[in-house]
Amino acid sequence: MVMLKISSFLAVYALVVCQMDSFQAAPVRPGLESITDRVTLSDYEARRLLNALVKDFIQMTAEELEQASEGNSLDRPISKRCASLSTCVLGKLSQELHKLQTYPRTDVGAGTPGKKRNVLNDLDHERYANYGETLGNN
């Protein structure tokens, strides 16, 4: 992108240098006279070239502005808009917390619904399981 801008400015500069000879202006440097003698453009060609360069430059700047406006949209996550500011870090943490709260639950792990075993109750139940049988036999 930068190379296109530089090349367009160089082309405009070359156009101006070529036109300096046609307007009988003094050259910037004496060494440029031989270059301007070899390269001559008619007024029509020079205007067309200048119009094309201006249109390209306007189109490039419009595309850059469009990309910049897309880059600052609210649809992008906060983490991509800024990285190290404290408000951005807090925003990123709140996004992660929200993701964890809205994330669908799975049926594995310690806090899942279903049959829960209590080890102490199981030991007491096994200890007194035969108590009723011994009373019935006496």
From Swiss-Prot:
Residues 1-25 form the signal peptide. Keywords: Amidation, Cleavage on pair of basic residues, Disulfide bond, Hormone, Secreted, Signal. GO terms for cellular component: extracellular region. It is found in: Secreted. The keyword Transmembrane does not apply. Its main location: secreted. Residues 26-79, 118-138 form a propeptide. PROSITE patterns: CALCITONIN. The modification Proline amide is found at P113. One of its GO terms (molecular function) is hormone activity. Coiled coil: none annotated. InterPro entries: Calcitonin (IPR021118), Calcitonin-like (IPR021117), Calcitonin/adrenomedullin (IPR021116), Calcitonin_CS (IPR018360), Calcitonin_peptide-like (IPR001693). Belongs to the calcitonin family. Causes a rapid but short-lived drop in the level of calcium and phosphate in blood by promoting the incorporation of those ions in the bones. This is Calcitonin.
